[in-house]
Amino acid sequence: MPINRRQFIKRSAGAVSVGLVMPKLFLSDALAQGPINPNRRILVVIQQAGGNDGLNTVIPYTDSRYQSLRPTLAFKEADLKTAQGVSTVLGNAPFGFHPALAEMKELYDAGKVAPILGVGYPSANLSHFLSQDIYHTANIAGGAGDGWLGKYADQKLVGQSSLSAVSVGGGSLPKTFFADKVVVPNISSFANYTYQTDQRNAGDRNNQLNTFHSTNRRDFQADSFLKVIADTGVDGADGAAALQTAIAGYSSPVTYPANNPLAAGLKMTAQIATTISAANLLYVSIGGWDHHSEEIGDNQNPTNKLVGQHNTLLGYVSQGIKAFYDDMAAHGLADNLVIMTWTEFGRRPNENASHGTDHGTANVMFVVGNPVHGGKIYGEQPSLETLALDNAGNMKFTLDFRSVYATILDRWLGADSKSILGGSFENIGFLG
């Protein structure tokens, strides 16, 4: 079936992950980092795919309803200590971080982390795919259309380096980056991000590349749409090689934690952001948050809240973000960086019979960085009282997630959030 240029742009972005197609990029001034531009604004988005349990992330440990609804899963104040015995209670606030968030607590105490409570949207959809699409697009009427950062790219990044926005480490391009005018590359690994030719003979590889260049440039000059395809492939061959050259110059005093998939993705993100000055929108995802069972515990102690799937994943997030923050700081970019986390929905207030939680509504987001007015909580924890829950027994959201997006668009990226989000949403005080 024939496709139009708009469809091609979106499909080709996915092909980039296997090193076949990439848009025009890499002007020479975009490769070298050079002196730090004080006006550079970097946004890194971290998706927690599957629906994180927000109530056991930023924990309302003083709430008697929280304790009664979760007789096995609930944390008491005495539980809110790291492995080193450091409290994760958030000062005088009636909340504490999960003990696995030790590094995030350190950043919070330094004023660099803003937890945002009660995040959601009207008539929440509890399907993973539909709710993810809603967060990707900021369209609560079914999640159709381009992504919210794709719309930003169409407004601000046309004609700029195509590494201005990059998805890192995933299998396919996140819908957040779907756009009409800009192709966003999806780099699953640096090793695979090359134009694929026979690697056994360097001379033959060069011949293949030269033939690809000359044939495609010659054959597709007459047709504007086919020329888009040819240009994309030809410039992809050039750009993939240039990317390898750029990241070869990366070095860091920071050791990222081993066996941590998010840390691995964030290290790739740092390699791009610290060596390519045009790379300012970056995206990485970590899955596995759908804990209908065995959210806590292991075979030896099934009710131990300090081990288990949720503990492990939160540790990945905390350790990964801290290593990435330290890396960016070591490269002089801490003042240029904002990190935002999101997940498609929260979990139900009550635990189930399998030491897990089922799909819920209101949840927690984090915004991290030197420009963030952190060290305090934003938003309002939804009431857990029976009469305050919705008809399905879920929490009622208190803050529209699009307000978080609007704040970042308006106060960090210098965009018009109303045109991107399709309406006006309250800016929150964590930036600006």
Where do the protein language model's features map onto the residues?
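Short, conserved beta-strand edge motifs with alternating hydrophobic and charged residues
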Residues: 283-285, 338-342
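Feature for exported/extracytoplasmic and membrane-associated proteins, marking the mature portion
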Residues: 1-331, 350, 367-368, 376-432
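Histidine-centered active-site microenvironments of extracellular/periplasmic hydrolases
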Residues: 343-376
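Alpha-helical scaffolds flanking conserved acidic
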Residues: 41, 336-337
